[in-house]
Every structure is written in C-alpha cells, then in structure tokens.
Amino acid sequence: MTTQPEQIDLSRTHMVGIGGAGMSGIARILLARGYSVTGSDMKDSRSVLALRAAGAEVAIGHDAANVTGGAELPTVVVTSFAAIPKDNPELTAAREAGIPIVRRSDVLAELMSDRRAFLLAGTHGKTSTTSMAVVGVQAAGLDPSFAIGGQLNRAGTNAHHGTGEIFIAEADESDGSFLSYSPEVAVITNIEPDHLDYYGTEEAYVAIFDEFATKVTPGGYLVCCLDDPGAAALAARVRAAGTAPTVLGYGSRAAADQHPDIPAAAIIEEMIPDARGTAAKVRFNLPGQEERYEDIRVAIPGAHMTLNGVAAITGGALLGADLEKVIAGVADFDGVRRRFEYHGEAGGVRVYDDYAHHPTEVTAVLTAAKELVEATDAGRIIAVFQPHLYSRTMNFASEFARALSLADEVVLLDIFGAREQPVEGVDSRIIGEKLTCEWHFQPDFSAVAEQVIGIAKPGDVVLTIGAGTVTMLADEILRCGREAQGE
C-alpha cells in the first residue's frame, strides 16, 4: 500500500526499479527539473547507463542500504507495485524509516500538475499513439514534456522535460494507477479485457475506464475510437450521463455512421495502404473550428496505426496545436522501439520486432504485416511468438491461436512468466494445438534463430512478437541469416 502525502516532496527521490520503461522516463524528467535522483535495478541496462550519465546514482541490486545508507534520507521512495514485491528490502527500509512510498503514477501526476495534460489510454496502442502525439505537437513548434512507455526512434529517449505548457503521457491502466491523473484531453484507443490477474473480472476492468473518464478536467475532452466497441460504448455511457467532459469520437466513416449520437471530431473517409505505410483522407470537425478535409500519412503499416495517428492529431489540435503542422509531424513519425520495428534483411528475409502480447495486438501487427507483404509482393509471414504471463496464456489461448493463424508459419517459444510462477500443464502448446497454420514449439531459446533461418525463404517476413526476451532474437536471426549467406 502506498503512503502518499498531499504534496510529494521530490527533492531527493529514490526509485526502486529505476531502469524500467516507465520509471526511467520519470527519472529523466526529475533530473531535468533539478531534483536529486537515486535508484536501484537488478541489472545494468542502456537506460541505467543513460540515467547515470544524466546525474542519477544507480545501484545494481536491491538493498536496504540503497535507501538508508546515504548522508541524507530520500524524501520519497517511488516504486511500481505491479513489478516490485512489497517485501523488497528497500521498501521495507523506507517503511521503517518513515519515508513516504508512492507509485510512479503519483509522481507523474505531480509533474503534470502545472501543465495541460494530454493522456493516451486504452488496452492497446498507447505507446504508438502517445509517440505520434509527441512528434506532432513538436512539429507544431511547441515543446511539450512527455513520458512514453517506449523509446522514440528519432529522439532516442522515452521522456523529456519541455518548456511548453503541454504534458503528453501514456496512461497505464494495468493496476488502476491512471486514476491519479487529471487530463485536459484523454484519448481512449480501445477497451477490451486484459490484466485480469489484477482486476479479477472483465466488468471490473471495463469499469475502471468509466472512472478514468471522470478525471478529465472541467472543459476538457474525452476522445474515443468509434471503431472499437469498448471505447465507443464508453463514449455513449459518458454522454448519456450528461456530465463533463465533452465527448468526441474518431474513426472510420463506417464506424461514425454506426454511432451518429457521438460527435465525430475526425472521420477517416478513405485509407490507402502502400509500401510506405498508409495514406488517408480525413474530415476534421473540431470544436470552434471550421470543418475541413486533410490528407494524412502514417508511415507505419496497418489500419490500427492510421487510427492511432488520427487520435494523436485530433488530441494535439484540441490543445491548440496547428492542425496542418501536427499532420506533417505525424507523417514524419518513424516509429517507436519494438513497435513494428524493422531490424534489417538477410538473404532476402526481412526481420521486424513487435511488443504485441495480447491477441488483439497480435492480430493488428500480423494484419499490418500482411498489408506490407501484399504491397511489396513479398513472400510468407513467419511469426516467432513468446507468450507473456501464464494467466494471460490460459485466459486467451484460443484468441491467441486465431490471431497467430494469420501468419503462414509460427514458431512458439516457452512462456515468459515475468512476475508469475509456472502453472502445471500450461505451456505454449495450448496455443499451438488450436492453430490453423503450420507451427513449431521450440523451448530451447538458443536454438530459435537457427530454426527460423532454416524455415525462411527469400521474400519472407519474420516477426518476433512478445513482451519478454523474444526481442533479443530479431538481431540473432539476422546474424544467423547472414552467416548462412556467407556475409
């Protein structure tokens, strides 16, 4: 349980698990604002090295002395309770010393408190949409602060302390902590059951988004994707309640026609996929502005990415950024690390990596891959999938199988358990048994790359998919492929 004062004293902040995607971003902003930052993590990493270079003191390993062994005690200890157990020695030391322990979301809320917050929430697509919003608002000549769950390819960072009045952030619903925020603009990309290990029921998971909608500031906007049944239903419920905030929708023409009672701020009239991504014609009808049609481009393949781009553009424009400049910025967006990230080509085989770890995300990335294959007259799609969490694998085995069956061939790795202990009788084969395409189960991680190169042919597209260590295989597959070619 957190012990949060009314106002958090961030002057000497200690962060447990400082190298994680969310924690490292907050640390970067704290350092840029002049606060003293210490922290710990289980191993060195690129983010830990970067934080040290920026002025943070980071210890490897968790030890009570990291909290109480310095000349001065920290004024606050920050953690992610989803990732760090309550009996962690640093948390125990903080409790015994009377140091407040808060969640990372509480600190992020404090950092946003003097800014106009633009938050991106939803089961899927948060990182990509947040990233596009950042590059779009930056292209409009503004300098927003931002905190993202992934690393912007071009900027090489996941966070920034800006001079402007806007703060753009990804709002993580996994443990309900996004209820700490008070956004002026909140985008909901989609809502469907996930994180049932925390919420218990689908109803509880959906209900947390209704509560999040109440956090939008007076005069603010809740912007929901009309193509997603869950997000559209939320928009309808909030409108029916007749209370703040103003509810707007975005999405395809077909979806807008299905929801005529939800004012559409942006309607995609046409989407044209090609080898460079997707071009689209969009009708914007933003409050206080004349209706206008604009051509947009999103360089990352997939209809889901086009929807994310439209969401980012709409939110930026609602905060006063110049619409045409935001559109130009999004067109120039070159992706986020581990979101349909191109790693290279070996022997005519192209290798991509993606963080997808929910059936809907897997469906989206494989659909995007099929669009890419069709646009470039390429060969087959080979998916290398590592399930994430035993509970998620059990709950969604059939859904994962349907999604992965979009590939021509699948290599299944062992489950990446993360915070969970193994469950007897549960491994990746419960997905494989339901696949309708050719598949292989490879429990030996060190043998995967060689097996994939043995399967792949020139023209094929290989996708490494999952939230765990599978990302390490993208470059290893390329290395094996080049060795096989004698390169």
From Swiss-Prot:
Q: Which reaction does it catalyse?
A: UDP-N-acetyl-alpha-D-muramate + L-alanine + ATP = UDP-N-acetyl-alpha-D-muramoyl-L-alanine + ADP + phosphate + H(+)
Q: Which organism is it from?
A: Corynebacterium urealyticum (strain ATCC 43042 / DSM 7109)
Q: Which family does it belong to?
A: Belongs to the MurCDEF family.
Q: What is this protein called?
A: UDP-N-acetylmuramate--L-alanine ligase
Q: Which PANTHER family match?
A: UDP-N-ACETYLMURAMATE--L-ALANINE LIGASE, UDP-N-ACETYLMURAMATE--L-ALANINE LIGASE-RELATED
| Phylogenetic classification of the source organism | Bacteria, Bacillati, Actinomycetota, Actinomycetes, Mycobacteriales
Q: Which is a Pfam family this sequence falls into?
A: Mur_ligase_C
The job of this chain, per UniProt, is described as: Cell wall formation.
Q: Which GO terms describe its molecular function?
A: ATP binding; UDP-N-acetylmuramate-L-alanine ligase activity
Q: Which residues form a coiled coil?
A: none
Instruction: List the keywords (alphabetical).
Output: ATP-binding, Cell cycle, Cell division, Cell shape, Cell wall biogenesis/degradation, Cytoplasm, Ligase, Nucleotide-binding, Peptidoglycan synthesis
